[in-house]
Regions:
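Long hydrophobic alpha-helices with heptad-repeat/coiled-coil character
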Residues: 61, 65-68, 122, 208-219, ...
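C-terminal beta-strand-rich structural cap/linker in extracellular carbohydrate-active enzymes
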Residues: 228-248
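C-terminal domain-boundary segment and adjacent tail
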Residues: 12, 60, 91-96, 100-103, ...
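Extracytoplasmic cysteine-anchoring/structural motifs
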Residues: 115-116
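Metal-dependent polysaccharide deacetylase catalytic core of the NodB/CE4 family, i.e.
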Residues: 5, 9-100, 119-132
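Catalytic domains of carbohydrate-active enzymes, especially glycoside hydrolases
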Residues: 1
């Protein structure tokens, strides 16, 4: 299953609301792209505010899920209007890479490899697959691209924009207090973001010569640990209690 972000501008949506809800129910993110796609630089703030809120309300009413990200119409990020768009969001799209008629297997693979090499996040954006603006000349090229990304899942994490934006924000805001003892670590996380908005678990990596066995517990629950030759990896709750790590 490949989850994606669908950016909806409701006044011109070419899907029924039942189809949009079906996508949402299957785990795809439905994001806000403005009710009438109003360019922030060309309309008064009150019209921009209405355009954003009206789309939020329509998406929530028809899917049951409030959009927590925003995609700027025409990529215009006028500062005063941007202050409205970011309210009650985990993030807004400030960069993207267009994927469509000009995409080749080579430049798509190069893009992904560069993201891996530079430890960066990438936001792929396509308007249409088989028809519409900048649609693929051969739609199979897009599916092949997804298969290539899937084959690299040990090196790359693919998530919806909401998931990735929340993760990045949480990672930057989380403080870890670490006490090292013999064959034991006590790690206390602290995160003060809005836990109703920022709900992603974080991943902790312990690097070094691998032990035969590593176990981790938080709030009385065992945390699944992935062991590699040079590191151990596990997810944890940044709002939770002390993480006890035993190294054997």
């Amino acid at each position: 299953r490949r989850q994606r972000q669908m950016c909806i501008r409701d006044s011109t949506t070419r899907m029924s609301w039942s189809q949009v809800k079906d996508l949402s129910d299957r785990g795809h993110e439905i994001s806000n792209h403005g009710w009438k796609h109003k360019n922030f630089a060309r309309f008064p703030l009150e019209e921009i505010r209405e355009d954003i809120y009206k789309n939020d309300s329509a998406i929530f009413a028809n899917t049951g899920v409030m959009p927590r990200t925003f995609v700027y119409p025409n990529n215009n990020k006028k500062e005063e209007a941007k202050k409205i768009a970011v309210q009650n969001r985990v993030g807004t799209r400030t960069k993207q890479r267009s994927i469509g008629s000009k995409s080749t297997p080579q430049n798509l693979e190069s893009w992904v490899n560069t993201l891996i090499e530079t430890n960066d996040w990438g936001v792929g954006m396509t308007h249409g697959l088989t028809y519409g603006y900048d649609a693929f000349r051969n739609p199979q090229r897009f599916w092949d691209h997804l298969d290539q990304v899937k084959a690299k899942e040990d090196k790359i994490w693919v998530g919806t924009f909401r998931e990735v934006a929340a993760y990045v924000e949480e990672k930057g805001a989380t403080q870890l207090d670490i006490v090292c003892e013999k064959n034991h670590l006590r790690i206390t996380p602290e995160l003060t973001l809005d836990k109703e908005l920022f709900i992603e678990p974080l991943t902790l990596v312990i690097k070094g010569k691998q032990k035969k066995k590593i176990s981790a517990r938080q709030d009385g629950k065992k945390l699944p640990v992935q062991l590699h030759t040079d590191k151990a990896v596990f997810d944890f709750n940044p709002y939770g209690g002390v993480i006890e790590v035993n190294l054997k």
